[in-house]
Amino acid sequence: WSHCCGQKQYGETPKGKSLLPRFLCARREGLIMIKKSVQLLMLSKASKSDEKVLEALMRVKAAGFDSIELNSFMVHPSSFMVRVLTKAAGMGVGSSGKRDWKGLIEKSGLSVTSLHSDLGSLERNMDSVVEEAKMFGTNRIVITGMYRYDYTSSSSVSSLATRLNKCGENLRKSGMELFYHNHNIELTLDEKRRRALDVLLLETDKENLSFELDTYWLGEAGADPKEWMKKMGERMKLWHIADRGWRSKKDQITPIVECDSVELGTGNMPLEELLDIAKVNRVEEIVLETHKNWINNDPVASLEISGKWLKERV
């Protein structure tokens, strides 16, 4: 960002060069400290007891992370249907609803990045969601997409933008900030050949809606994460990060391997370039999230490897 010309300075940089020097020069008040966070879903396997949770949280802290991002369906008991749906999506919640997350997070010395919720809950009972977020010490509430929603319809997507804008405006009155978290469905084209994520960006006000951009899902959908990060600019205040690749097998039969999330720096996502853009965008927190394919099937060991990669760069 250039204070002299009032425009962002992305452009192409020579090989081996970074956007970081320009970023540093732009900060009159000094270096921005980007916080590093872990999505609570990565700790679901450790939720069998408060003792196990605290042990995992302490390892998160030791790995260089500053905070935890919470999900409303994990911090209190969820219905049977929610547990079934999340498990089917590869996001099992374990016994997390029985744990004292507020007390355990405080004991670990970590803070809370944000609370993931859903638009319906906010529209029906905003005060309750706000109260829960404030209890955990965060002013950020994140909507993680819509279930059974027609993203191919321009009117439906525009309606969603209107609802998000109104909800964000109402949240601001309580000192809260609304975010939208993408997956891959937001790259769906409607009948006007518009992508849903573009519509949400263009038809909402920056004061009412910020974005938690998930570059893993953009890459999975075949899009260019760098271009989307540049397009979002400073409305991208949170960044969901994961690398994408595979684990090599000696007995691989075919020349086609199945991709999945892998530890940061071990896959094929252009993470160094994405990190440079995140710094230009003044991203506030980087949130690590993977659901499976962890090294030795151990999510905490996996986040420790990714934490080392982040610690060396952030």
Predicted regions and their residues:
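Histidine-acidic metal/acid-base catalytic patches
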Residues: W1-S67, S72, R83, K134-G137, ...
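Glycine-rich, proline-tolerant flexible connector loops at the mouths of alpha/beta enzymes
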Residues: E69-D100
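Surface-exposed charge patches
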Residues: M58, G103, E131, E169, ...
